Structures are given as structure tokens and as C-alpha cells.
């Protein structure tokens, strides 16, 4: 928690060569930024159009990870204008989570990166062996087992 808010962060740092007075290592923080963190969205039902079905790509990187009851996703999508893109995670079946994007018609711009995190408090590590993450990519629908995102 930070100021009463639950926040995920990403830190770019380098190890220092200097000796420290404690058992750990000293680092210099080069950059630190917060990651948008949210709960999963309510079920689809009447919200299907609200959640959108615009494509995005998940990037297989160290920042795409399921750990500590959070699913953090590094993604790429087209950002062309000044329209807000909405990214949501919905549980569409007992064993399926679906990542959805509503780009509000803003799909033709240059491809850019983004990070988003979702709280998965009710999903145990054992459940991750059976749960599938599904999303619409630029090349069609893709899936991955949640357990494959544990590092």
C-alpha cells in the first residue's frame, strides 16, 4: 500500500559496487513508475460491447507474470489518437479468463507498449494449472495456461 492505495510498480535499477553496512546489496534507482492495477471486471452479460473486442498482443517478457496474486501483462496495441483505451480481464468460464480491449475506434495508430496488472485474489496457484488466459491478437485468438506465466 502507498498512501492507502494498493499499487504495483516497476523499477529500473543498477547494482552499485560500493560495500554496504547491511547484508544486502546497494542499488541506484534509475527509473520507477506505477503500473495501472485493477480488479477483474464483472461478467460479460450486458457488458460485452463495453469491454470491446479490439486486438492486442501480449509480450513474452519478464514483465508478463503471475505472482503474488497479481497478473501483470506487458502488451502492445495501436494507439493513434487521443482516445482512451480500456483494458479489462473477465472470467468468462470457471476455467477461462479473457483479456479484452475497447480501443474506442483507435486501432490504426503506431504500435506502442503498455503494462497493466489485475488482482487475482481468488485464484490459487493450484488453480492456475487449469485456468486459461484468452485474448484476441492481431493474428487471431490466442490462449496460454495461467501457470505458464509463473516465474
Regions found by a protein language model. Give the residues of each.
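OB-fold/S1-family single-stranded nucleic acid-binding modules
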Residues: 14-44, 142-144
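Short nucleic-acid-contacting surface segments enriched for D/E, G, S/T with interspersed K/R
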Residues: 1-11
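His-enriched metal-coordination microenvironments in redox/metal-binding proteins
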Residues: 63-95, 108-112
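Short, exposed beta-strand-loop hairpins at the edges of beta-sheets
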Residues: 18-22, 121-143
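Beta-strand/beta-sandwich contexts
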Residues: 39-65
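Hydrophobic residues positioned within well-ordered beta-strands of beta-sheet architectures
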Residues: 9-11, 71-73, 114-118
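An anionic, turn-rich surface loop/hairpin at beta-sheet edges
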Residues: 94-120
Amino acid at each position: 500500500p502507498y498512501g492507502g492505495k494498493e499499487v504495483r510498480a516497476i523499477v529500473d535499477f543498477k547494482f552499485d559496487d560500493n560495500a554496504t553496512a547491511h547484508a544486502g546489496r546497494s542499488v541506484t534507482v534509475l527509473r520507477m513508475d506505477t503500473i495501472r492495477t485493477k480488479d477483474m471486471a464483472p461478467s460479460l452479460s450486458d457488458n460485452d460491447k463495453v469491454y470491446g473486442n479490439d486486438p492486442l498482443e501480449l509480450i513474452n517478457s519478464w514483465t508478463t507474470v503471475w505472482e503474488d496474486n497479481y497478473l501483470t501483462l506487458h502488451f502492445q496495441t495501436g494507439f493513434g489518437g487521443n482516445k482512451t483505451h480500456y483494458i479489462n480481464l473477465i472470467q468468462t468460464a470457471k476455467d477461462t479468463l479473457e483479456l479484452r480491449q475497447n480501443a474506442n475506434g483507435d486501432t490504426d495508430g503506431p504500435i506502442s507498449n503498455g503494462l497493466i496488472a489485475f488482482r487475482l485474489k481468488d485464484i490459487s496457484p493450484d488453480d492456475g494449472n487449469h485456468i486459461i488466459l484468452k485474448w484476441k491478437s492481431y493474428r487471431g485468438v490466442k490462449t496460454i495456461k495461467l501457470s505458464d506465466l509463473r516465474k
